[in-house]
């Protein structure tokens, strides 16, 4: 226990595989769950003062944590999950579940968030990655965000400053961490919103291997192509390394079918990139982030 951080939920040498969608990942030296911005500031100030590395893990849905784990503090925002409405503006803390946030918009007959109704993860991660699906993306509704800088300061970033691109935002370079974000929604027809969300969720269930642990879509969409189709054309559907395989249901996904490891994921990703480039001339770029230390 760290005396200076008494009262904050901090777990030492905690295996991260229990917190990731892939169900892989080694231990964090310190895994912290702040309940509010004050506790978050205490953790970051302590880490910076003592030259201890720190990072925010989010909901770890489009992420692979290596088997050696992560040194220093890993901060999870599970308890920072408030969602508020002010007219047609929705404000959500970074730890708010993205799918549950879309349900809040639906309940209040607000349209604009339907595209995200089946995307796993957190609000903070969705902004970081400019998450999107079925023609929609976070950039289309984003207004602004409060972020925590690497130095521990809080500042506001506008939509223009966020410089969104395909699965990209400026904070991927700056290291700023989203604390909360505001989104501009519009009044809509409740039944129409429900129908659209039901349609998109049905498509996901038909096409995606939701019954297995995975990191979601592994590769970015290459211009003029679909990653899943290129992987199928390379005869890699069902290809397996250790306990991880290319999904037979959707080749753009890699699933943990038999107690796989992060090493299995990395080797399979590398094999797919190499083989697809050999067969099609297209070099796939991972969408999934890989962090931490190897064993």
UniProtKB/Swiss-Prot annotation:
Pathway this chain belongs to: Cell wall biogenesis; peptidoglycan biosynthesis
Gene3D superfamilies listed in its UniProt record: 3.30.465.10, UDP-N-acetylenolpyruvoylglucosamine reductase, C-terminal domain, Uridine Diphospho-n-acetylenolpyruvylglucosamine Reductase, domain 2
Active-site residues (renumbered): 167, 217, 287
Every FAD-binding PCMH-type domain range: 23-188
One annotated GO biological process: peptidoglycan biosynthetic process
UniProt xrefs under InterPro entries: FAD-bd_PCMH (IPR016166), FAD-bd_PCMH-like_sf (IPR036318), FAD-bd_PCMH_sub1 (IPR016167), FAD-bd_PCMH_sub2 (IPR016169), MurB (IPR003170), MurB_C (IPR011601), MurB_C_sf (IPR036635), Oxid_FAD_bind_N (IPR006094)
Subcellular location: Cytoplasm
A GO molecular-function annotation: UDP-N-acetylmuramate dehydrogenase activity
Catalyzed reactions per annotation: UDP-N-acetyl-alpha-D-muramate + NADP(+) = UDP-N-acetyl-3-O-(1-carboxyvinyl)-alpha-D-glucosamine + NADPH + H(+)
One Gene Ontology CC term in the entry: cytosol
Needed co-factor(s): FAD
EC number(s) recorded for this UniProt protein: 1.3.1.98
Family affiliation: Belongs to the MurB family.
NCBIfam families cross-referenced by the UniProt entry: murB, PRK13905.1
Function: Cell wall formation.
Protein name stated in the entry: UDP-N-acetylenolpyruvoylglucosamine reductase
Organism of origin: Streptococcus equi subsp. zooepidemicus (strain H70)
């Amino acid at each position: 226990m760290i005396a200076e951080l008494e009262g904050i939920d901090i777990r030492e040498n905690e295996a991260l595989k229990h917190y990731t969608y892939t169900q892989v990942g080694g231990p964090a030296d310190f895994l912290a769950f702040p309940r509010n911005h004050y506790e978050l500031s205490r953790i970051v100030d302590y880490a910076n003062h003592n030259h201890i590395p720190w990072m925010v893990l989010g909901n770890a849905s489009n992420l692979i944590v290596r088997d050696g784990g992560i040194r220093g503090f890993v901060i999870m925002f599970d308890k920072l999950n408030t969602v508020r409405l002010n007219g047609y503006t929705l404000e959500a803390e970074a730890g708010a579940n993205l799918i549950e946030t879309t349900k809040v918009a639906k309940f209040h007959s607000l349209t604009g968030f339907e595209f995200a109704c089946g995307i796993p993860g957190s609000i903070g991660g969705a902004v970081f990655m400019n998450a999107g699906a079925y023609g929609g993306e976070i950039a289309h509704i984003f207004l602004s965000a409060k972020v925590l800088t690497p130095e521990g300061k809080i500042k506001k970033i506008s939509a223009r400053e966020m410089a969104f691109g395909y699965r990209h935002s400026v904070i991927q370079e700056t290291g700023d961490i989203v604390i909360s974000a505001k989104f501009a929604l519009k009044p809509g027809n409740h039944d129409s919103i429900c129908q659209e969300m039901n349609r998109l969720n049905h498509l996901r269930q038909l096409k995606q291997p939701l019954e297995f642990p995975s990191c979601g879509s592994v590769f970015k969409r290459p211009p003029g192509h679909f990653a899943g189709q290129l992987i199928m054309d390379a005869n890699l559907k069902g290809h397996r390394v250790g306990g991880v395989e290319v999904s037979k249901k959707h080749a753009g996904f890699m699933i943990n079918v038999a107690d796989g490891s992060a090493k299995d994921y990395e080797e399979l990703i590398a094999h797919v990139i190499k083989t697809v480039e050999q067969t099609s001339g297209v070099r796939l770029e991972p969408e999934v982030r890989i962090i931490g230390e190897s064993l």
